[in-house]
Amino acid sequence: MSEQQMDLKDLMPTKRKYMWKTAEDRRMSDLTCVLEWLERRQGKKKQAPEKQKPKVVTVLKRNKKKEEKKGKGLMTARGGNRRDTETSQQALGKRFRKDAASYRSLYGVEQKGKHLSMVPGSYIKDGPKKSDTDIKDAVDPESTQRPNPFRRQSIVLDPMLQEGTFNSQRATFIRDWSNKMPDMAYERKLKSLMEKSTEPKMETMRMLKPEEVLSCRYLRLSKENIRTLLKLCKDAGMNVDIHPHMVEEDIDAKKVFTGIPSMAL
């Protein structure tokens, strides 16, 4: 019985995994697990390319053999077309050389060994440096070839030249103005005639009769207007039955004008 008890005790764990471990122990155990996993992963990565290398080499060797066989077959089949291909290649090479030469001459590309430099010849360090006199000589013909027509008058230093240019301009301006003067006068006359013909003729204002004034529906008579009407009627010798306090609706032309209605004021 004692032996069986001892065996059972050996089988049972003396520690529980999570109860007696501190936080530091747990952290360290996690770190060790992570490190082991990383080592395993790196070892797998290193082994993978080593295993794949011989396969690639064998595949390349097979492809090379196939290409060599194909090339031999093509050479035997296209034996008669070799000369045509060579002539076409020579023509292409000549054309390419011509294009390269024209490109260099246009854009200033100079050849240095195998490489081409895009820097123009005037800015290359190894090239011959131009002196100040050469630069001035190159600038002078450009300035003479391209005269600026919009140059300011202040650039001319000699006052006599300035006076001559101004006098010539004045003379040309006066000539043009004198030639245009009769045309301008003629145009003014034409404009005045056209305006006179288009102007509406002013008609003489016709004096309204009191009957017409009072029979207007939309007329609002003020006190002053009614007074003036009364004066006009009295001056004309008409007896008018109207007073300033009357409303427009109360005014009736037939009752107001009992005398001669056709008589003008």
UniProtKB/Swiss-Prot annotation:
InterPro entries: DUF4638. Residues 126-139 have a biased composition (Basic and acidic residues). Pfam families: DUF4638. Disulfide bonds: none annotated. Residues 62-94, 118-149 are annotated as: Disordered. One of its GO terms (cellular component) is nucleus. PANTHER family: RIKEN CDNA 4933402J07 GENE. This is Uncharacterized protein C16orf78.
